[in-house]
């Protein structure tokens, strides 16, 4: 790339440049306004390929490597070629492999492949991994690993923040898109506007289905993958989903198994009908969530917490679940409100564990908001989320049956140590 900036609009320059007519190609002559010439060495040209991150052909065409990859399920993309290339590129020596429990069955095969084709030592991290917030680069570094591969979750924690090199492997899954398309066409009138999303494994399928249905003249459907940044378009997390305009959508459709991630969107958008397509059993179901009960239970927890004097402020230590900035902000606001604060670090939050802190009146956990939403009733003391604690302190708006924010890891969310747009101060 040339060092010239002539094509950009700039203020009048002090020097007027021209190439020297009789010099070699690595010189550049500039003439000052007083007539003196200044000779500069020209910046060397660097040929930058269009695909800087393209996996080399010798890795893609390695017959032995490709044979080893066949030991893994063909519809699961573990991105072995990309992993091998990154390990070699960074000259890594000790690799940590972190994946959810459902994929641990494949961990030893992947471990053997990487050891054989990269000449490295691998370490399988067997602790629970609920989501991308659980990436445990701290433990990996403590175990002398210089590289961690995190499977099946998106890049929630940026790679420039982690303490060692990280490669996120989404483990995208190939599914029968034609069946999804026929199912949606059978259940929704032509021209329906459907917010469609899923976990990161099915994100390619969401976008592929969108394109195919948009181009189907006989029964076109507007499939709209919503986005709450910094998540990918069409991606949803159990704690983070986009707030949708009920006037703009006829329905929401979640592609994936289970309800955990879908519930985030239903809690955030209770007035939009929700459906789920399970790609494993190929069932399409109408889903519901008892928003009234949610509001009653969480409002009661806040009311009980108002009487509390001693607050236990929990920093989640499961991977990177906790956020120290959010803890500091809550501590400051609680102290300003006349509360006594006891800070606690926990990797996992259980009712039996918190019951041991008998002198604490209220707990506020900076770990996962779904702990409070789903299991708060099981604790003998109120267990508030950062958002609910902010409502208690009159720093955020109160929720209702029509609105409960699920934007924890949004760019300005509490999960990132920021102040969300719905906050009062």
Swiss-Prot record:
Residues 1-60, 366-425 are annotated as: Required for function but dispensable for interaction with DPH2 and DPH3. GO terms for molecular function: 2-(3-amino-3-carboxypropyl)histidine synthase activity; 4 iron, 4 sulfur cluster binding; metal ion binding. Gene3D superfamilies: Diphthamide synthesis DPH1/DPH2 domain 1, Diphthamide synthesis DPH1/DPH2 domain 2, Diphthamide synthesis DPH1/DPH2 domain 3. Residues 1-29 are annotated as: Disordered. Its cofactor is [4Fe-4S] cluster. Changing residue 239 to A/S: Resistance to diphtheria toxin. Abolishes [4Fe-4S] cluster binding and catalytic activity. [4Fe-4S] cluster binds at residues 133, 239, 368. GO terms for biological process: protein histidyl modification to diphthamide. Pathway: Protein modification; peptidyl-diphthamide biosynthesis. Binds 1 [4Fe-4S] cluster per subunit. The cluster is coordinated with 3 cysteines and an exchangeable S-adenosyl-L-methionine. It is found in: Cytoplasm. Belongs to the DPH1/DPH2 family. DPH1 subfamily. Catalyzes the first step of diphthamide biosynthesis, a post-translational modification of histidine which occurs in elongation factor 2. In association with DPH2, transfers a 3-amino-3-carboxypropyl (ACP) group from S-adenosyl-L-methionine (SAM) to a histidine residue, the reaction is assisted by a reduction system comprising KTI11/DPH3 and a NADH-dependent reductase, predominantly CBR1. This is 2-(3-amino-3-carboxypropyl)histidine synthase subunit 1.
